[in-house]
């Protein structure tokens, strides 16, 4: 007879490309290592652990004993190693070739380093797109986990989410596990007893139910106050002890065991989705606030509760709409990926250089710098700089991949580089890459120093965020953007003084026309009145090129006899 409840517990540990060594070290000390040591003391607790590629490489260099411990616990079948895309990209932003390559390369790394078989994967930010199923299956993935939000958006009821399902794409199938939002909030922010009560309610509803927890390992030691809660005060110890005491009716299972031993509930085709909070963060501030109000109101109204699961926000892809800087990084990565694929197909490039360029491209696709939610994300300059550094490195390696193919002259390429339906201009030589956007104020939006692997214009505009209302409200009034039932915590006083918004891009060659007596403070905080729309208007561009010289001329049409022009040589 099957157990009353099978409990699958999945932990996702990640630090992004470009994060500081001290952050890696502190996270290992406060969360990753204490959890493994706690598991050693509770052999009855079986979990699946995903360690992202950037973190695994750092651990192998700084704490190889941690990976050795993972390998031993995997060999003892107390834990299952979960694969993924190597450098933790959101797969929705990758072409299929890069999705498959990232997954296969990381599976090979994990199986070689940890000497274990990898059958499942963690999807970064649990961002799902229906077109992924075939790519994941082609990469050898047998199962993954997604939020119950995805399943509810497909029309499944709560009582259908106590089992795993299949999904399908292009004739290939994949097992998918629904992660309980209730358990995500209870562990570790409720009490251990609440988690057990939830499992008990599943057992009462249907014998043989499956419960799935899956969330960030940083919740157990890195997030504010969680090291004290989870380890010093013994929250996790209490949970594990309660689970071991409940072994007569709760069976801790590894995901691959469930896939092998338990028939799926059926096949479901899931819509594009992520976890609930992510679908809200991607919306503009006003829409975000409206979406949250609608969801909370519907959940609280018995007449509307049935439709509440269908109230969700937007597509993860639209972070590229919210933040043009994210789209600039994405477009840069796509340009590298396209060039790399073309050189592979030509067959005359150095395979070692292509391999190194692939690694650099994959590192430049690490997701954290491409969006913003509860944590810094795209607002962190060291993450943006790291992405550009890797993408510039990849381009440089591709330059060297063909014999005698180093860039010696200067060239201009005109095309729609950023997918906005308008042309941009890329001017390149050995030391520099310059990218112009005539239709967006004639700005220079990227300037790469190739030898330094650095984009001087990896800047970020100041723009409205939904939580700015909480910042302006101040301590004692503001609510947490993660859980509105909790007060917001302020790291410093006077943050409201820094809430400013830019009326134009923070780039180069932006033409501003202010009155002579303009207040410099008004210029700095973005409130100075401008005469004309030269900073944001559409310029006409002409490129004049010779063997040793490229001139880009921007003309701004006016009603007067002469146009406003700017020229870059």
Language-model-derived ranges and their functions:
Residues 5-95, 101-102, 119-123, 142-148, ...:
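Short, well-structured secondary-structure segments
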Residues 2-33, 40-42, 160-174, 178-182, ...:
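Active-site and substrate-binding clefts of carbohydrate-active enzymes
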Residues 556-561:
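Short, small-residue-biased leader/transition segments that mark boundaries at the very start
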Residues 86-90, 149-156, 160, 176-190, ...:
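Positively charged, amphipathic and often flexible ligand-engagement surfaces
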Residues 25-29, 97, 101-104, 430-544:
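Acidic-aromatic substrate-binding/catalytic surfaces of carbohydrate-active enzymes
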Residues 32-39, 67-71, 100-110, 133, ...:
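Generic structural signal for well-ordered alpha-helices
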Residues 98-125, 172, 200-215:
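CE4/NodB-like, metal-dependent polysaccharide N-deacetylase domain
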